[in-house]
């Protein structure tokens, strides 16, 4: 069936989140449209933008990646080739040389690159030893390294010739869920794992565990996501699989705040159902940080985080409700220069298989109005065990 999407006019609203917004000014957002990506038990894992925001890529539990217009929801095509769960996707950050290239890693042990103009695979790196790849990052002092987080290992390749240059296997004892090169120090690589450790490596020279592991942060519980924060990217936020939130200085290993009851603090900060899980953190630049929490019924809130000791989580400053009916897996907020003209806030995807596009809407009576496109990628129902997307 041909994929189509409804287009409708939306009002332009102020969409800037502020860490000082009073509770009475909480912004609620209404649906622009909703795209059903599949029938059955298939669902959305991750949504990422092309660098110029002319497309968004969406990874699905069908082991495929589909591309859409972030403004109209128009379907562009799909990248198909992985034989197991797609764990991470990202567009190339090189706006001049390869803005159309999309990268993906999978539990099938490969990292693949796709030309999103033709939707064809253009490169493939294979671990060759039944490894799963849970995360990847491009960087290095010469911008030639590709790091992959695997089972108990961090692998590094020279992506220019697909040659493996290092296997760091003594630093972690469990699945490596995250790898990130530091944006302004591309020779520095951070890895995070189910073992509760965040490791800092220097990737210059002949890379090995003994000489290039610079420091270790012990978070103490299984790590789900990490990300950079603050001027100079010196801080690191960390979300764990038991829904705790902590902020660290990765350079000296100090913990600025550890919110062990972050989910309870967020639940107490709004009038919706209890926050059941955290989706991600939002850091648009500078020192401001929001943690994005959701309910099992599909409502999502942006909660401002005060990470000065003793730390606190404030009243939700944005609420996305009425679009999903199950756990939300990914939230993608559009920058004002790309979504503002159309009054768009961003996109969400979840375990209900829906992609929801959100518009600003100050009128509370409009919050639950939605415009639903035709069913997309119609497939016959099939019996399939629904597995949570998990690194372990």
From Swiss-Prot:
Chain coiled-coil ranges: none
Keyword terms, alphabetized: Developmental protein, Growth regulation, Repeat, WD repeat
UniProt GO BP: regulation of growth; regulation of seed germination
InterPro entries, A to Z: WD40/YVTN_repeat-like_dom_sf, WD40_repeat_dom_sf, WD40_rpt, WDR89
Effects seen without this gene: Fast germination rate, fast growth rate, increased biomass accumulation and early flowering.
Tissue occurrence: Expressed in germinating seeds, rosettes leaves, flowers and siliques.
Q: Where are the WD repeats?
A: 81-124, 128-167, 171-211, 323-368
Q: What does this protein do?
A: Involved in the control of plant growth development. Acts as negative regulator of seed germination, cell division in meristematic regions, plant growth and overall biomass accumulation. May function by regulating ribosome activities and biogenesis in plant cells.
Q: What is this protein called?
A: WD repeat-containing protein GTS1
- Phylogenetic lineage: Eukaryota, Viridiplantae, Streptophyta, Embryophyta, Tracheophyta
């Amino acid at each position: 069936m041909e994929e189509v999407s409804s287009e409708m006019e939306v009002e332009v609203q102020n969409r800037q989140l502020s860490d000082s917004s009073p509770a009475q000014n909480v912004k609620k957002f209404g649906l622009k449209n909703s795209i059903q990506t599949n029938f059955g038990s298939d669902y959305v894992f991750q949504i990422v933008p092309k660098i110029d925001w002319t497309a968004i890529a969406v990874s699905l539990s069908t082991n495929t990646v589909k591309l859409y217009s972030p403004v109209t929801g128009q379907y562009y095509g799909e990248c198909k080739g992985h034989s197991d769960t797609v764990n991470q996707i990202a567009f190339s950050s090189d706006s001049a040389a390869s803005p159309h290239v999309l990268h993906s890693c999978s539990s099938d042990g490969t990292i693949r690159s796709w030309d999103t103009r033709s939707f064809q695979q253009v490169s493939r790196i294979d671990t060759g030893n039944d490894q799963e790849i849970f995360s990847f990052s491009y960087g290095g002092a010469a911008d030639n390294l590709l790091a992959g987080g695997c089972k108990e290992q961090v692998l590094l390749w020279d992506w220019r010739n697909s040659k493996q240059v290092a296997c760091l296997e003594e630093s972690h004892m469990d699945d490596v869920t995250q790898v990130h090169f530091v944006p302004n120090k591309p020779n520095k690589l951070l890895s995070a794992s189910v073992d509760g450790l965040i490791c800092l490596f220097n990737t210059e020279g002949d890379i090995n565990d003994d000489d290039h592991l610079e420091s270790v942060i012990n978070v103490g519980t299984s790590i789900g996501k990490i990300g950079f924060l603050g001027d100079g990217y010196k801080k690191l936020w960390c979300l764990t699989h038991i829904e705790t939130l902590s902020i660290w200085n990765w350079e000296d290993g100090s913990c600025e705040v550890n919110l062990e009851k972050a989910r309870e603090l967020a639940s107490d900060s709004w009038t919706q159902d209890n926050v059941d899980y955290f989706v991600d953190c939002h850091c648009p630049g500078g020192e401001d940080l929001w943690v994005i929490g959701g309910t099992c019924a599909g409502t999502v809130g942006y909660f401002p985080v005060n990470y000065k000791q003793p730390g606190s989580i404030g009243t939700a400053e944005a609420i996305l409700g009425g679009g999903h009916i199950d756990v939300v897996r990914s939230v993608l907020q559009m920058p004002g220069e790309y979504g503002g003209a159309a009054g768009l806030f961003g996109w969400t995807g979840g375990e209900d298989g829906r992609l929801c596009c959100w518009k600003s809407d100050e009128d509370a009576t409009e919050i639950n109005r939605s415009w639903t496109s035709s069913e997309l990628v119609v497939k016959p129902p099939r019996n399939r065990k629904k597995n949570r997307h998990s690194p372990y």
